[in-house]
Each structure stands twice: as C-alpha cells, then as structure tokens.
Amino acid sequence: MLQYQIDRVDYQIADDQSQSGVFVIGPLDRGQATTLGTALRRVLMSGLEGTAVTAVRIAGVNHEYATVPGVREDVLDILLNCKELVLSSRSRDTEIGRLVVNGPASVTAGDLQFSSQVSVVNADCPIATVADGHALELEVHVERGVGYRPVERTSEDAAALDLLQIDAVFMPVRRVNFTVDETAVGEGGSARERLRLEINTNGSITPDDALAYAANQLIALFQPLATVTLAEEPGQEPEPSAESQIPLEELNLSVRAYNCLKRAQVNSVSDLMGFSYEDLLEIKNFGAKSADEVIEALERIGISLPQSRTTA
C-alpha cells in the first residue's frame, strides 16, 4: 500500500487576508508526484466551491454607466470594487448585504450588513467615497458557486432594471504551483520523489481545507472505477473446443455403432456431448456394447458423458 507523509512547511496570512501554504508530499515513486500535482492543481483552481457577489443595487441608479451624486467613484468603479469583495457564505440561498452611509465617509466592505450566514473576509476593501451632505444606499447579492459565471441577461434578476449584474468569480484559490524534487533512492535502486505544492487562497478558505476538499473530490471521481464490471457483449457464445469439432468418422467406431449414430443425426463429437449413457441406450438398435464403445472412444480424447440424463 502506498504510504507517504504530508507536511505543511510554510503558512502565511497577507495584509489583504489572503492565505498561502506550502506542502511537501512524499516519498513517492517516479512519476507519481507529477500525477498528484497536476490533478490537485486542476481541482484546486476550478473545482472548489466559493462565494461571490453576483449583483448590486444602488439607490437611484438603473444602469452601470451612471454616476451617483456626491460619490467620487462612478457606478462602473463601484461594481469593480464590489467584485473584489471576499466573502464566505454558509447558505445555499442568495444572501443580501445592505448599507446606508452618510458623507463624508469612505465606504468599505465592513460597512455591509449581512445575516449571520455570511462573513466578510477583507473588511477593509474600499467600495466608494461619499462627500459631505450626500449619502450612498447600496445592496449586494451574494451566492455560492463553482468556477466562473458570466452575467445572464435572460435571468429573472436581470429583468429588474435597478439590479446590476456582475460576472461572478467563485474560485477561492487564486494560485497553485508545484515542483517535483528527487530524493533518496528507494528499494531496487528506483528514484524517489517529493511533491512541493504551494496553494494561495483569497482568505475565505485555508490552504489546508482547500487541499482536503480537492483530494476528496478526486477520491469521489475515481471511486466508481474501483468497482468496474465489464458487461458481456450480447450474442457472444463461448467458442467450442477443438475436440468437440471432431467428426464422428474419426472416433473409429464399429460399423454397427457408427450407422446407428448417423441415423440418429449424430455427425460429430459436439452432437454426442448432449447425450448421457442412458440416452445412447435409447437409440434404435444401439445396445450396451455399442454405448460402452462410444464412451471409451470419447474418454480417449478427454471427454466423458454422464451416466444418466439431468432433470430440470
């Protein structure tokens, strides 16, 4: 059974709350490090579930090219800032975060009020700057998903004129790199390898959890292959043995036994294999001596007939 160690040799949290971890996996046989690294990287980058802002509503705004009175950023800039929010939602439904801010103020992600199902990772992420005497009223729609989801112009939410859709990037892992290092020589002189895997997340998930989720996805993907059973193709029958194809003439039977079998439509050994000793005795003019002769001839080529017929 394959056995190896998994060590986390480095772990850091950046100022923007993104997290990075470095894992060393080994020892592995030659080629296994690349196999593991490639499969894990693909799942980590595109297969993990994450949380993203999918739509924004701004009071008094009905299209993305508008401006908000008293707000330094135009609507496009506000949408781009909302796209940078890093959130973690435990709900399967769409969650809504709201804020109402009076100027002067610098509006950040921490000003958004969500239910207890959603937490804001990068609370310092800027959203907008509101001047004195003005206000900004805004809500964001948050969903869980996998990969990248472009704006759906035909969706129900898109029909609402004041709800501005955003291309959603759900991927919680930002970057994955791996290298393969050769280590000591194993049994039989074969080279051994170690996989060095670096995982960088947006902070909504730890590198340890990301690695565990990716591994479980791969296990679920490969598990059905462990119980594959190949169905037989319909219509296929086992090929008859060479002995069963021997013609009756080659058994060197007596003339009496040969003629009786021929009259009973027995032309080869394969025809005889459907008979028992009792069946042979029922052939017209076929006595015990002829039956014994047939049994002996078949035994010489490795075939034996049952004494009595089988009953269902």
Swiss-Prot record:
GO terms for biological process: DNA-templated transcription. Pfam families: RNA_pol_A_bac (PF01000), RNA_pol_A_CTD (PF03118), RNA_pol_L (PF01193). One of its GO terms (cellular component) is cytoplasm. In cyanobacteria the RNAP catalytic core is composed of 2 alpha, 1 beta, 1 beta', 1 gamma and 1 omega subunit. When a sigma factor is associated with the core the holoenzyme is formed, which can initiate transcription. Transmembrane segments: none annotated. NCBIfam families: PRK05182.2-2, PRK05182.2-5, rpoA. Residues 241-312 are annotated as: Alpha C-terminal domain (alpha-CTD). Its EC number is 2.7.7.6. Residues 1-229 are annotated as: Alpha N-terminal domain (alpha-NTD). HAMAP family: RNApol_bact_RpoA (MF_00059). DNA-dependent RNA polymerase catalyzes the transcription of DNA into RNA using the four ribonucleoside triphosphates as substrates. The N-terminal domain is essential for RNAP assembly and basal transcription, whereas the C-terminal domain is involved in interaction with transcriptional regulators and with upstream promoter elements. This is DNA-directed RNA polymerase subunit alpha. It is an enzyme of class 2 (transferase). It catalyses: RNA(n) + a ribonucleoside 5'-triphosphate = RNA(n+1) + diphosphate. It comes from Synechococcus sp. (strain RCC307). Belongs to the RNA polymerase alpha chain family. Gene3D superfamilies: 5' to 3' exonuclease, C-terminal subdomain (1.10.150.20), DNA-directed RNA polymerase, insert domain (2.170.120.12), RNA polymerase, RBP11-like subunit (3.30.1360.10). Keywords: DNA-directed RNA polymerase, Nucleotidyltransferase, Transcription, Transferase. The gene is rpoA. GO terms for molecular function: DNA binding; DNA-directed RNA polymerase activity; protein dimerization activity. The keyword NADP does not apply.
